[in-house]
A protein has these predicted regions:
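Alpha-helical transmembrane segments of integral membrane proteins
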Residues: 351-608
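Juxtamembrane/start-of-transmembrane alpha-helix segments at the extracytoplasmic/lumenal side
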Residues: 294-308
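Juxtamembrane interface at the cytosolic side of transmembrane helices
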Residues: 309-352
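Alpha-helical transmembrane segments of multi-pass membrane proteins
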Residues: 19-26, 316-321, 358-368, 454
């Protein structure tokens, strides 16, 4: 595929300009337009675990005028920016906020020198780490001279809520409010609850639903004996969501709020944050009082989605620019004859449908293989383990499909391996030089992508996180243990996806309309069924209050599959345009493997 001279360079330049603009806007929202200082940091627990944090410090907070503090714990698998909604809104109101990963998640992980494996060869994170990590963060936050340690708030989403309630119980003289978002765990009842408490949980919270009888059963959560005991209700009394029990002004306030949202959406839902701000307003006087309805955090969500799209555009255009340079021009081989099914014929549509199914049918099953609680080879990779299984099964399925196509169609037409994109030259021979240059190309492209992200990350002090998709810097302790492993396990899907698509997609040069159609087809093959699975999962939870795939935590796959969709769209876009330009899968394979490994290592990085 020839690129009109300068088009790729212009696209790359525009993506960089827009990236700078969006980064500035993200900094503006995150810092309340300069009124709040934001910093990143790490603590080390007694077990040698890195505790990654992000801190928001209003410029009004000082030694002479200390501000109340908020310790926020994000949910399992998330990075610190999953707490941005609460951090932005609390810091706008003058609070010092510290958001941390649950140890074993995000960028909080055991140092490589202390990671060990059990008798089943599973990576072990000390069980005391999550509790110790949140306690360590709380002690650090309250030790800061500009924090009023007598006016503290703790809370978090999912696992973060479970561990911060333990912190609150350990510091009942200091903590004025504990809020659990999507977590019906209330610590140790014997320690008491001498602080205000709010449970904010979606009516369609799939995690809570699956822990009950799994259908329209959120009332089981509200009428839980431990929760009613905390609220001062008897066994025969009903707890009414939306009703305030006790008095928040006297630190005896209790409330359950039930916005209509899902577990994975709760930290991004305006109504959830407004309920938190209402409880905060009723609990204490903050330095900069604002109505609970005055929120701006959603703008960061929109901007981050834009940055994820720009990352895709930047990497794709950079690849095209590099391929037009003298160094890498020889990677562009002559177009090969198309031996695939006739476009728009009945058999072509059938083949596209088969490819769509093959790319998505195994994802929930794969999730259940690592979610049953029974250790196996892939559980060592945490939440990324099921994606390895999915890649293996999908790659094998696409290999069988390709073999059947070749036996029934390709061989009769004189199709050769080079016509599947395996060529390394135009003479039909294997050229090691071509492979070496493709590897060099991949290293440079990945360095450009990583450099682009790191410039963004250290400038904005934010990762790229949208619900279940996340990109972080690659932690050194994961680089050898997981990054190279993810490249290996993602190889079957990345390789066979490029090969199998040649049975239905023309990658040679064509008119713009044909290119757009081919790109849409290519993307649909990779992600259409995955997206449908996620939408069916979400629809059942949101509208029918039912968690499908409850067995062996298959619902985790229902949630996480959208992260696979976003990551796959990025790598398939890069790969599609590289395939069009090079007419070979090798530059595409080498260039996209490190990208997909990066996404798998840092997205949903739960490691226990």
């Amino acid at each position: 595929m020839k690129t009109k001279k300068g088009i790729a360079s212009i696209v790359m330049a525009v993506s960089l300009v827009l990236s700078v603009l969006l980064s500035l806007l993200i900094v503006g929202v995150d810092t309340s337009w300069g009124a709040v200082d934001v910093k990143l940091g790490k603590l080390i627990s007694e077990n040698g675990t890195t505790i990654n944090y992000k801190m928001y410090i209003p410029k009004t907070a000082s030694v002479q005028n200390p501000a109340p503090g908020l310790l926020y714990g994000v949910g399992g698998g998330d990075g610190v920016d999953a707490g941005h909604a609460f951090a932005i809104e609390a810091s706008r109101r003058g609070m010092v906020v510290m958001s941390i990963d649950v140890p074993g998640n995000g960028l909080s992980e055991s140092l490589s020198s202390v990671v060990h494996f059990d008798e089943n060869n599973q990576a072990v994170v000390a069980q005391s780490d999550p509790t110790q990590g949140h306690e360590l963060a709380y002690n650090y936050l309250t030790s800061l001279p500009f924090v009023d340690s007598t006016r503290m708030v703790t809370g978090g989403h999912s696992m973060g809520g479970m561990y911060t309630v333990q912190v609150a119980q350990n510091h009942q003289d200091e903590v004025k409010l504990q809020f659990n978002v999507g977590m019906n765990n209330y610590g140790n009842p014997e320690l008491g609850y001498d602080f205000n408490f709010a449970l904010i949980i979606g009516t369609s919270d799939e995690s809570a639903l699956v822990r009950t009888t799994n259908h329209c059963t959120m009332d089981d959560i509200y009428q839980n004996a431990d929760l009613k005991n905390m609220f001062g209700l008897g066994e025969d009394e009903r707890l009414e969501p939306g009703t305030v029990y006790g008095d928040f002004a006297n630190e005896t306030g209790r409330a359950v709020y039930t916005p209509h949202t899902l577990h994975i959406w709760e930290p991004y839902t305006v109504e959830v944050v407004e309920y938190f701000l209402t409880c905060l307003e009723d609990t204490m006087e903050v330095p900069n009082a604002l109505p609970a309805s005055d929120t701006v955090f959603v703008w960061k969500d929109y901007l981050v989605v834009g940055m994820i799209a720009l990352l895709m555009v930047f990497v794709t255009s950079t690849a095209c620019v590099l391929l037009d340079t003298g160094v890498f021009r020889e990677l562009k081989l002559a177009p090969r004859k198309y031996f695939g099914f006739k476009p728009n014929s009945a058999v072509w549509w059938a083949a596209v449908a088969v490819l769509v199914v093959l790319c998505g049918y195994s994802v929930i099953w794969a999730s259940m293989q690592t979610g049953s609680g029974e250790p196996n080879f892939f559980t060592r990779y945490g939440n990324s383990g099921f994606k390895c299984i999915w890649s293996l099964v999908t790659g094998a399925s696409l290999l069988v499909y390709t073999a059947v196509f070749y036996a029934l169609v390709g061989r009769k037409s004189g199709m050769k391996l080079g016509d599947f994109g395996l060529a390394t030259g135009d003479d039909g021979r294997f050229h090691l030089r071509y492979i070496g240059k493709a590897l060099l190309f991949a290293v440079i492209l990945f360095a450009a992508a990583l450099g682009y992200f790191l410039l963004y990350y250290y400038f904005t002090k934010s990762n790229l996180q949208w619900i279940v998709f996340e990109i972080d810097p690659i932690p050194m302790q994961r680089a050898g243990v997981k990054f190279l492993a993810m490249m290996f396990w993602m190889l079957p899907f990345v390789l066979m996806n490029s090969v199998a698509q040649r049975t239905v997609i023309r990658f040679e040069e064509g008119k713009p309309a044909a290119t757009v159609k081919a790109f849409i087809t290519s993307t649909a093959i990779c992600v259409l069924l995955l997206a449908i699975i996620h939408l069916v999962f979400v629809g059942n939870a949101y509208f029918a209050y039912r968690t499908i795939f409850p067995d062996a935590r298959g619902y985790i796959g229902g949630e996480q599959v959208m992260g696979i969709v976003v990551g796959t769209i990025i790598i398939n876009t890069v790969g599609f345009f590289m395939n069009k330009k090079t007419n070979s899968i090798w530059p595409t394979l080498f260039a996209t493997l490190p990208l997909v490994a990066w996404f798998q290592v840092t997205a949903s990085g739960m490691t226990f």
